[in-house]
Amino acid sequence: MVEYQHLTPNEQAHFVEHGWLRVPNAINPEYLDPWLGNLWTRLGMRSDDKSTWTDEFLKLPRHREVPNEEFCTPEAWTKTIEIIGGEDKIHPYRERYFGDQFIVNFGNEHWKSHDQTPTEAKGWHVDNDWYRQFLDSGGIALTLIFLFSDCPPRGGGTYVCEDAIPGG
């Protein structure tokens, strides 16, 4: 049994009820500026010129990676460890690293004044649904989603479908 030292009772209850937990400021600031510093160069676009934004969203490949425990702030990492039941539950090399494989959502003019309900959203998927899962398969215990910038209303954030999470 895990002895909770970092998750508050409210966070524990929220995770059990909803199947997810928001941890603000979860990214170690040491990685924000260096990783975001060359983002627009990698994209081949200019942040100050929307005419160069040629796609609504792009997925960039990973160029750099660090162990999750370095990438996360200590608060975020210790809460992650408690959620999964202890550090011994993490495979020594699979699922241990996070990198700069950004998914960038540029949006378009339409979304400035239009809302989209979850049922209208495209791209619904189940993570790791492209291979047969086993109890010791990677990526099945907990998915970490990091936001590198604020996500304003209509800003293209990730929907989480609680009804699809068993027990959620």
Which stretches of residues belong to each language-model region?
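Non-heme Fe(II) oxygenase catalytic core, chiefly the N-lobe of the double-stranded beta-helix
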Residues: 7-10, 15-18, 27-168
